[in-house]
Amino acid sequence: MTQEIYEYANKIERALRNLPEYKKVVAAKEDIEKDSEASNIFEEFFKLQAKLKEMIQNGQTPSNEEQETIHQLSSKIESNELLKAYFEAQQSLSVYINDIERIIFNPLKDLI
């Protein structure tokens, strides 16, 4: 039985990789990597996201300057078609991820 659960998990992984939505995210990321402007904005976004996550974990809130940086970066993302396509594809894929997560963790609710 223990081995079986890992087999199911691996099947889910393979199924996710075969989803058209997953493939769209992969293709969108490849397009970003080919474009230096989009790639720079993309990298900047993930650095800022990590910084904000750390701040929140430490109970800090972004300063006015940091909030302005967030706003400017959001505008850059919205105006870049490659980045917009990537985040839209991510959003479509996240529907599956959220549903799968809900299904997997549903039995754990019984333990609380």
Swiss-Prot record:
Domain of life where this protein originates: Bacteria
Coiled coil (UniProt feature): none
InterPro entries per UniProt: Com_YlbF, YheA/YmcA-like_dom_sf
Family per record: Belongs to the UPF0342 family.
Protein name in UniProt: UPF0342 protein SUB0718
